[in-house]
From Swiss-Prot:
Top-level taxon of the source organism: Bacteria
Record's catalysed reaction(s): a plastoquinone + NADH + (n+1) H(+)(in) = a plastoquinol + NAD(+) + n H(+)(out); a plastoquinone + NADPH + (n+1) H(+)(in) = a plastoquinol + NADP(+) + n H(+)(out)
The species this protein was found in: Prochlorococcus marinus (strain AS9601)
Cell location: Cellular thylakoid membrane
Keyword Zinc in annotation: no
UniProt topology in membrane: Multi-pass membrane protein
Pfam families recorded: NdhL (PF10716)
Enzyme category, top tier: translocase
The protein, known as: NAD(P)H-quinone oxidoreductase subunit L
Amino acid sequence: MESFFNNTFATLIAYIGIIFTYLLVIPLLLFYWMNNRWNIMGKFERLGIYGLVFLFFPGLILFSPFLNLRLKGSGKG
């Protein structure tokens, strides 16, 4: 079991998992959360979301050309 933890392959897999989570999974969850709750968030929830946006900014930048958070208007004009 000790040789598994000293293995370079296991370390590489761990890094890939962390990077995948940091750059892809959590930013997509943040986009989904903000898109669904933007108009009904409380002040502490909004403060927490702003903190998470600051923390996961690199991943959000990766998705920003493809996703947007434009509010849906009345459709007139």
